[in-house]
């Protein structure tokens, strides 16, 4: 039995005991989480190229946190707190392949909601499935991502999942780079939430004397440029 209970519209909400457990835990603070990311050297400045081909003056490497079970769980717990506070309703958790799979696994475990896995492409052997796991057609999926730029990876994943007769209405990420994802995803009827924003990261780097206010505004202006 999972932590999902049926509602009138066919979606599901997290069971009360799980909600209470999440709410009772000490909230993950943005500053504490930033400090852990900083210590793990997740922030790099310079010239880096994203999947989109766009150059960025700052790169956030959240893949590094999979090497720290404690920090990885902090990230998942922070997402779960956001999920519960936002009263999101869903039947399954899916990590955007493949960097978000560790996060999705922990979110599934903390909330006691089934996880599915979406392959980048269907297997050419065996069952040839694109979606791995046990699910009912018409169920609702929550997408989990680590870092979001324009939201394109989420859009691609949502489209593929919808083509498998599943619904996708919400997506959540650890970090929003604030490069248009919220508006882009809204065009596909996707509600987007995040725990951290790029501006919060830049503010944290200022407190570490790694950046000036002037440089922060230069980076924000650069990130605001259209792709």
Curated annotation (Swiss-Prot):
The keyword Membrane does not apply. InterPro entries: OPRT, Or_phspho_trans_dom, PRibTrfase_dom, PRTase-like. Pathway: Pyrimidine metabolism; UMP biosynthesis via de novo pathway; UMP from orotate: step 1/2; Pyrimidine metabolism; UMP biosynthesis via salvage pathway; UMP from uracil: step 1/1. Signal peptide: none annotated. Keywords: Glycosyltransferase, Pyrimidine biosynthesis, Transferase. It catalyses: orotidine 5'-phosphate + diphosphate = orotate + 5-phospho-alpha-D-ribose 1-diphosphate; UMP + diphosphate = 5-phospho-alpha-D-ribose 1-diphosphate + uracil. 5-phospho-alpha-D-ribose 1-diphosphate binds at residues 51, 119-120, 123. Expressed in body wall muscles, spermatheca and vulva muscles. It comes from the Eukaryota. Orotate binds at residues 149, 177. Its EC number is 2.4.2.10, 2.4.2.9. Homodimer. Phosphoribosyltransferase which catalyzes the formation of UMP from uracil in vitro and thus may be involved in UMP biosynthesis via the salvage pathway. May also participate in the first step of UMP synthesis by catalyzing the formation of orotidine 5'-phosphate, a UMP precursor, from orotate. This is Orotate phosphoribosyltransferase.
């Amino acid at each position: 039995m999972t932590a999902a209970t049926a509602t009138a519209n066919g979606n599901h909400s997290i069971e009360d005991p799980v909600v209470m457990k999440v709410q009772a835990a000490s909230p993950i603070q943005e500053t504490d989480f930033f400090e852990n990311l900083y210590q793990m050297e997740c922030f790099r400045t310079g010239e880096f190229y994203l999947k989109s081909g766009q150059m960025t003056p700052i790169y956030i490497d959240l893949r590094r946190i999979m090497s720290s079970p404690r920090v990885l769980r902090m990230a998942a717990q922070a997402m779960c707190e956001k999920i519960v506070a936002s009263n999101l309703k869903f039947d399954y958790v899916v990590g955007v392949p493949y960097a978000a799979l560790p996060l999705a696994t922990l979110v599934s475990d903390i909330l006691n909601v089934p996880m599915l896995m979406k392959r980048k492409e269907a297997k050419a052997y065996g069952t040839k499935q694109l979606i791995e796991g046990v699910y009912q057609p018409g169920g609702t999926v929550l997408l989990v991502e680590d870092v979001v730029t324009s939201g394109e990876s989420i859009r691609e994943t949502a489209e593929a999942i919808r083509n498998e007769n599943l619904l996708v209405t919400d997506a959540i990420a650890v970090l929003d780079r604030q490069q248009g994802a919220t508006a882009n995803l809204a065009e596909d009827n996707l509600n987007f939430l995040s725990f951290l924003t790029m501006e919060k990261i830049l503010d944290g780097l200022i407190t570490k004397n790694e950046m000036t206010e002037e440089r922060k505004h230069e980076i924000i202006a650069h990130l605001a440029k259209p792709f």
